[in-house]
Amino acid sequence: MSDSDEYVDLPVSDEEEWEDGESEEDEEKVGSRKKAKVHAKQLKRLQEKDPEFYKYLEECDKELLEFDDDDFDDNEGSAEKHSSVPKEEPKEIVKPITMQMVDSWCQGAEDGKIGSIRSILEAFRKACHYGEESGNNSAPKFSVMSGSVLDKVMHFVLKNMDRILRELLDAPSFGGKKETVSELMITKQWKRHGRLMRLYLVNALHMITELTDEQMVAFTVHRVRASAVFLAAFPALLRKYVKALLHTWSRGRGAMPLVSFLFLRDLCIQLGSECLDTSLKGIYKAYLVNCKLSKSISGSKLQHIQFLGNCVRELYNVDPQSAYQHAFVFIRQLAVILRGALTERGPKTSKDKKQKESIKPTKKRMEKSYQKVYDWQYIFCLELWTSVVCGCSSEEDLRPLAYPLTQIIHGVACLVPSARYFPVRLRCVKMLNRIAEATGTFIPVSSLLLDMLEMKELGGKPDAVGKAVNLFSVKQVDKKTVKTRAFQEACIFSAVDELAKHLAQWSYSIAFFEMSFLTLVRLQNFCKTVKADRFRREIKDLIHQIKASAEFVSSKRAGIGFSPNDPAVDSFLQVEKEAKSSPLSKYVATLHQRSQDRMDSLDDTSVIVGAESSTFSRRLSEAQKRQDEQDDGEDTIAFSKNLLTEKKKTKTPKEKSKKRAHNHDDVATEEDIVEDLILSSDEEDEDEDKNMESDEDDGSMPVEDDSDDDFVDPDSQWKKQKKEKSKKRNKRQPSKKGSSTTKRKEKIPHPKKKAKH
């Protein structure tokens, strides 16, 4: 088959062809009229100026002299009459694409034949749009192809087209930058064949956005990633790719999020500012969507959110200077939310009390203010920016964000000083310890932990044993759990762990003796008041390690001769710090192993929380190896299994209505679960109980207002109505066993449900 026989024209709409043809015909008619009139005038001039030559033309060339411009107008009118008669358009003959045709196209494309490349790309376009309807006709628009042919086309194009087009366009064999594409767009090869690259990228994007099979989408994204740099030539297509990749990254499972992120990261590195700002904004918003959670969180979901956070941190490390502006805006938003919660929470001075008496915020407004802060979205955003600042602590661009972020985290920890929110406080302490370690800045964390230990809920006698509590999978606990021994044990052990980590960071400082003095005094006082022996032993062990480290530093400090403001202070105990030889550092290692064993016993998933969570580089390399192993096999992914059928499935109105009814039933069952919570007697606990109910209904930030201002003790009213209804039914019906079972019981709607719906 010759090169010209294999050529397949790219699709052009009928309207465009007709308009182009009509405009060309009009131009030709106008031009021919002008030429005819000019020619007739020239002949008249010739007859007047040179009659002898005119006679010669009459004898030799009569046709030239017999020319008349009126004849042209007559011919034109007759042509219009003929054109006004409608002609029957010939029907298109749809030819099926066979395996022999595909094999010949593939071989020709490997040899660099342009006709074969066009044909295989046209077949790829037909495969990507297979099963879609065109206009009002229900018949398929494109040629028929079998499943084996479709698989062959998809695999060949996705695996080899980037290399083939690079050779055709004289582009670098791998990678490239924006400047390379800018130079390439001036060449003749790009002007001739550049639209082939666009055809390949457009249809691949259609596959990514339309397919529902995650394995096929991941394979497509992984293969198209090699051509990412060529999107610099198509800005509109680049924006669509960024939007599609953010969607697959945030909503996908398996290998799809990782492959999508690697594609997005390559775009930001290779193209720079063209897509970096859009990607930084979009990936943060997509991360927020995944953080909409209820009261508690599972281990698998926590691990997934940590992976997404690592991706965000990696993308913000690409260009710290551009990332600073976006990070500053987002951290400022968190500060504004915290400021609103602090101002509405309650007065602190007599002057504030007088001002509050004049303008009293409603109970609903107060609940809404600090629910925005004690929400999973807000907490995970703080952890995200903590990891970003700690990961770029050596960069001067992001280092100034450490101070405002520390202020926000400290304010969140002190917002509601209640034992029910100890999980949030412990998370905040972990974040502050990470910032202090990364930046080398002292942060007064010990006061937050010592205030926890001195609360009456941890020092008093528990009411029950209770179940084991994982403080890092919840953001608050109920009132019954606070009074259990398991909760006391989890809080005290976690506080000791974080306090030891904080002091171990500064156990090599020349001022450690003075720094740890107040902490030592308060721990000794707590040791006297605590009643449980196991808690007393735990605190005594920590006190012993603090004293040993203070003596260790004092002995080393006695042998030096420089003053405290001498620059040589920075080198004090530098060798011991690198070796981690202080007593507190060794004690922290044993505590870390113990806390890890405790977490493993609580969680079957063994999710590590904090700085040691899911390492990005290790996961990246493992996923890359798995993807390469899958790509080695030719038939690893069968596109024909789902591609030929999934696009044809359309939901009927009945199915949609059934789905809406099913979702409505699910919402009702969730509300039933929320109503089983017992309201507390104290005013503060009543607010927190209602907050727990609203958190289960909706975990978004800010929390939507689901309660009513006139909501007062709905359970008692509901029970009274049900008793009255049962009494009336018993009076009307005789007391028979059969009658009570046959008749349907009338359900009394709960007032709280009625108000919500």
From Swiss-Prot:
InterPro entries xrefs: Noc2
Keywords: Nucleus
GO function terms (MF aspect): protein homodimerization activity
Biased composition (Basic residues): 719-735, 742-757
The keyword Nucleus is annotated on this UniProt entry: yes
GO biological process: ribosomal large subunit biogenesis
Subcellular location: Nucleus
Gene Ontology terms: cellular component: Noc1p-Noc2p complex; Noc2p-Noc3p complex; nucleolus; nucleoplasm
Pfam family, one: Noc2
Biased composition (Basic and acidic residues): 78-89, 619-628, 644-655
Main location: nucleus
Domain of life: Eukaryota
UniProt-annotated stretches for the region Disordered: 1-37, 67-89, 616-757
Family to which this protein belongs: Belongs to the NOC2 family.
Protein name listed in UniProt: Nucleolar complex protein 2 homolog
Organism: Oryza sativa subsp. japonica (Rice)
